[in-house]
């Protein structure tokens, strides 16, 4: 179970916090709230009820706290009591955090109030307590009873963090020039208090700069298996080995938050929901005009005698079936129990394998660790002996794992892991024989002819110069750095490598929670730095890359020729032969309805004038209309859609969109007037679904149809008889 947390943020909202200083484009309050919002949204994103937050406003115009009778606590307001923070709380807090019209208010008194809030809320329970003060250090601060404050903070194990705008921090390397004497005095006062409490004192610039570094989420792992590591059957043999062990995740895939579906809330839907329960509130819930999408699943069975040809059945009346090919095979519960393998939870050793005989590609899962039962020294000692035996013999163990009774067994590999203060078994899943697929690929260093001859020099094989050039280029791109003494160090430490998807989505969600109307900021450089090689390596390897390009005879592909397709020079084959000339292909005059698409393309390819293209379109129009007119129901609809799609694509390529647009307008007019074999409005719905509308200016520069005009000539048609819209 996660630790309980209680954090109180004290935010200085004084008049001076609304000013811009030291060349910054934002006020001190906006700058400070970047850090506060980042901390609050990170806590809200966890969704934990045990992670609670309280917020106090310092130097507010009014006073609102339980100690407001004392003059020391004037101009201090409790914005939010300690509680679990949710989205509505973030919205309310955003409206409260504004610069005030005064600089009166004691930061030390605000810390005392925060201590009082934590003591009242946490009582004597086990909590992780924390107070964060963000201020610019202006105004008056009391230095009375600092010893008592320090004593109380230590007694209750409260972490005190003080961050100041433009506070001096020698460790970070920042010092404000020309500092106001009152601010310097307040800085010294706060620094002394924090040091006496063993807290953290720093400048806000460092805290804001570290926000770009993604935070790895630390989770408290839970045992996925508790049982025995055994060798032999203990029920039959007294010599069987049994060691109580526990299994935990070593690595686990972190997944970003999944998307949720929402729809606009309607008054009709709200009234309908209220009619179902008289206990629902009449006022709209938090979240405004959106409501979540709820799925409703119904099961229907065909029945000619039922209204609509179907009748509904309850889920309880259905029988479970499995797909075998395209056939649904029913299996009763009795028969299904027979297919269930009866197993019991255990980790049974079945064999051993030398480390050099095992291939790493056999891994089929993330890694787990096996340790001795917690609190059982005898089990830990026995498992340690087994681990050292595997290590000394350079062996891995193969075991059969059943994590829970009647669960399917899996085969796992157990590898010893010995560190100075920690020993365990690393466990990874192995494939069954049915999981292994064997594929044969041609060799990369030779070519075997049909007759069996082995060829080592071939146009598809790299020669020695190319191999040497590639080797030198790869060596020049080595991602290894050196320290001051010249010793190699890891150039890409795993702790500095972050998942762009995971942390980008997380930061975007948290930013959108605070700024619902602003565009999301670009991703952090810490996430994008690995998307391209380091610039110094690129410059270093430039000469080797040029040598590699010369050895491989790399040539730049000419840009795609723009212009009308019919006046372009036809692409020449590598052989240099004109296939059409060799076959003496004659120019086509008529397009056959049985082979319309290939012959239409061929006619356009051979076209030398616009009249030839118009004639081909006219023939295709006649063929399409004839197929629609003679279609029995929707028998020819798929063919018509395919032909229209080809016509549309080809006329875009030949930059003649007007021919297609004129054809489409005429076709729509005939269909709506039922001149092509009756009611064919369903075809329009299919054309709309296939996106075969007018060619607009975005698709072709030669078109005179705008996107708005294309939408006006809508393909949507009301099919009331079929219930399709």
UniProtKB/Swiss-Prot annotation:
SUPFAM superfamilies according to UniProt: C-terminal domain of Ku80, SPOC domain-like, vWA-like
Determine if Transmembrane helix is one of this entry's keywords: no
* Localization: Nucleus; Chromosome, Telomere
Any one GO biological process: double-strand break repair via nonhomologous end joining
Which reaction(s) are listed as its catalytic activity?
Answer: ATP + H2O = ADP + phosphate + H(+)
The record's region (Disordered) falls at 267-290
User: Which intervals hold domain Ku?
Assistant: 229-476
A GO cellular component annotation in the UniProt record:
chromosome, telomeric region
Q: What is its EC number?
A: 3.6.4.12
The UniProt entry's coiled-coil ranges are none
Per UniProt, the keywords (alphabetical) are: ATP-binding, Chromosome, DNA damage, DNA recombination, DNA repair, DNA-binding, Helicase, Hydrolase, Nucleotide-binding, Nucleus, Telomere
Q: Does the keyword Electron transport apply?
A: no
Q: What is its main location?
A: nucleus
List the CDD domains: KU80 (cd00873)
Record GO terms (molecular function): ATP binding; ATP hydrolysis activity; damaged DNA binding; helicase activity; telomeric DNA binding
Q: What does this protein do?
A: Single-stranded DNA-dependent ATP-dependent helicase. Involved in non-homologous end joining (NHEJ) DNA double strand break repair. DNA-binding is sequence-independent but has a high affinity to nicks in double-stranded DNA and to the ends of duplex DNA. Binds to naturally occurring chromosomal ends, and therefore provides chromosomal end protection. Required also for telomere recombination to repair telomeric ends in the absence of telomerase. ku70, of the ku70/ku80 heterodimer, binds to the stem loop of tlc1, the RNA component of telomerase. Involved in telomere maintenance.
The entry assigns this protein to a family as follows:
Belongs to the ku80 family.
Q: How does it assemble?
A: Heterodimer of Ku70 and Ku80.
Q: What is this protein called?
A: ATP-dependent DNA helicase II subunit 2
Q: What lineage is on file? A: Eukaryota, Fungi, Dikarya, Ascomycota, Pezizomycotina
């Amino acid at each position: 179970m996660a630790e309980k947390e209680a954090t109180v943020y004290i935010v200085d909202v004084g008049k001076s916090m609304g000013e811009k200083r030291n060349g910054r484009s934002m006020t001190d309050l906006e700058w400070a709230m970047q850090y506060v919002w980042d901390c609050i949204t990170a806590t809200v994103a966890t969704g934990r009820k045990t992670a609670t937050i309280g917020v106090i406003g310092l130097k507010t115009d009014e006073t609102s706290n339980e100690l407001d009778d004392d003059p020391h606590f004037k101009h201090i307001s409790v914005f939010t009591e300690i509680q679990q923070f949710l989205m509505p709380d973030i919205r309310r807090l955003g409206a409260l955090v504004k610069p005030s019209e005064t600089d009166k208010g004691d930061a030390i008194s605000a810390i005392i109030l925060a201590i009082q809030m934590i003591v009242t809320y946490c009582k004597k329970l086990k909590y992780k307590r924390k107070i964060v003060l963000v201020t610019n250090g202006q105004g008056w601060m009391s230095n009375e009873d600092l010893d008592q404050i320090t004593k109380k903070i230590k007694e209750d194990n409260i972490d005190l963090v003080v961050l100041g705008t433009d506070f001096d921090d020698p460790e970070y390397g920042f010092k404000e020039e020309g500092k106001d004497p009152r601010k310097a005095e307040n800085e010294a006062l706060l620094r002394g208090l924090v040091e006496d409490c063993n807290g953290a004192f720093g400048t806000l610039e460092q805290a804001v700069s570290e926000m770009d570094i993604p935070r790895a989420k630390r989770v408290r792992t839970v045992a996925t298996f508790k049982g025995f590591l055994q060798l032999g059957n203990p029920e039959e043999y007294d010599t069987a080995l049994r060691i109580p062990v526990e299994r935990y995740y070593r690595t686990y895939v972190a997944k970003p938050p999944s998307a949720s579906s929402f729809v606009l809330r309607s008054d009709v839907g709200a009234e309908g929901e209220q009619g179902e329960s008289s206990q629902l509130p009449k006022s709209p819930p938090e979240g405004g005009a959106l409501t979540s999408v709820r799925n409703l699943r119904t099961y229907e069975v065909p029945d000619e005698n039922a209204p609509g040809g179907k009748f509904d059945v309850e889920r309880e009346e259905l029988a479970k079936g499995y797909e075998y090919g395209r056939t649904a095979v029913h299996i009763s519960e009795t028969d299904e129990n027979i297919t269930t393998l009866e197993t019991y939870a255990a980790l049974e050793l079945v064999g051993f394998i030398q480390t050099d005989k095992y291939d790493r590609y056999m891994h089929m899962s993330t890694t787990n660790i096996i340790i001795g039962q917690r609190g059982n020294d005898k089990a830990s000692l026995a498992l340690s002996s087994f681990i050292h035996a595997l290590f000394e013999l350079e062996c891995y163990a193969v075991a059969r794992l059943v994590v829970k009774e009647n669960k399917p067994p899996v085969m796992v590999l157990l590898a010893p892991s010995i560190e100075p203060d920690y020993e365990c078994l690393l466990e990874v899943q192995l494939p069954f024989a049915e999981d292994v697929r064997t594929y044969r690929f041609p060799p990369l260093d030779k070519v075997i002819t049909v007759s069996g001859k082995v060829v080592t020099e071939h146009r598809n094989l790299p020669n020695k110069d190319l191999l040497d050039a590639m080797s030198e280029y790869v060596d020049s791109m080595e991602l290894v750095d050196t320290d001051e003494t010249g010793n190699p160090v890891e150039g890409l430490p795993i702790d500095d490598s972050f998942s762009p998807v995971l942390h980008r989505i997380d930061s975007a969600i948290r930013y959108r929670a605070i700024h619902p109307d602003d565009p999301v900021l670009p991703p952090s450089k810490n996430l994008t730095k690995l998307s391209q090689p380091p610039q110094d390596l690129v410059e270093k390897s430039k000469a080797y890359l040029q040598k590699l390009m010369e050895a491989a005879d790399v040539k730049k592909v000419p840009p795609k020729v723009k212009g009308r397709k019919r006046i372009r020079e036809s692409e020449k084959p590598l052989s240099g032969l004109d296939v059409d000339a060799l076959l003496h292909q004659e120019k086509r005059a008529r397009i056959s309805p049985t082979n319309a698409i290939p012959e239409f393309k061929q006619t356009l390819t051979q076209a030398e004038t616009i009249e030839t293209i118009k004639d081909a379109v006219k023939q295709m129009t006649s063929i399409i209309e004839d197929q629609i007119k003679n279609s029995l129901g929707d028998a020819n609809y798929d063919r018509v859609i395919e032909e229209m799609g080809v016509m549309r694509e080809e006329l875009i390529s030949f930059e003649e969109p007007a021919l297609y647009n004129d054809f489409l307008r005429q076709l729509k007019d005939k269909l709506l007037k039922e001149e092509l074999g009756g009611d064919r409005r369903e075809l329009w719905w299919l054309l709309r679904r296939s996106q075969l509308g007018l060619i607009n200016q975005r698709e072709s520069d030669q078109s005179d149809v705008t996107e708005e005009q294309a939408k006006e000539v809508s393909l949507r048609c009301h099919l009331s008889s079929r219930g399709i819209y």
